[in-house]
Amino acid sequence: MELPLHETVPSFVLRFTSDENDNKKILIPSVNTNRKRASALSLAQVRESAYGFGTALMSEDVVNRPWKKGEVMAFYSENQHDYLVAALGVMLAGGVPSLLSPMYKPEELNHAFELTRPRAILASVNTYEGAKNAATKFSQTGAGNVDVYVFDEEHERSMYTHLIDPGKKLRASGDMSLETVRINPTTDEAFYCFSSGTSGLPKAVRLSHSNMVTNTIQMTVTLGGRVNKPVYDP
């Protein structure tokens, strides 16, 4: 198989399939979620929301200034059905999601911040207070203000209220700022993932877009076997 080395994670994941598959609900909220307004998402909805998220990051209305390529958003949350939406949105804007364990203690969180220098944190309702305290502490080191957003539709710092919905409106009005972002899939980071820190503090692992696209194809083939229609067909 010839791997698509020209693909970024967003371009690969968000490619249009068919009307039937595009509108099928694929991301389902947990039955145990405490988010009252959480709803299942189709690929079309993931695409629209991710582009809204990324567009908002690059807008003049975002806190401080528009995001630049390579800037980092720390994800400090337990699993969420729309985790992928936010991660793709950050990548569309040229940013890098830094994926942190919601079990991190303050010293581990601060260490992760020192390694990746995040501009913003995306937390859950459960981790919000810890994220807010960590952001304040990190800002006091001279790192600048660290914005905090939340995976919740009703929270005062909701990523929907502050990023996705405003970004959708900008996109609908003709904002094409995301089309100016240039990413080299083989050299530019898609994610920072952290090791368990078994020996010492957690360590950041840099994964490129090509790394992630290749792994996605490998897992699709492994899990799908010869039963399902291939998701990727070069």
Predicted regions and their residues:
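Conserved AMP-binding A3 loop
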Residues: 40-43, 182, 190-217
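Conserved coil-to-alpha-helix start sites within the AMP-binding
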Residues: 77-88, 103-107, 234
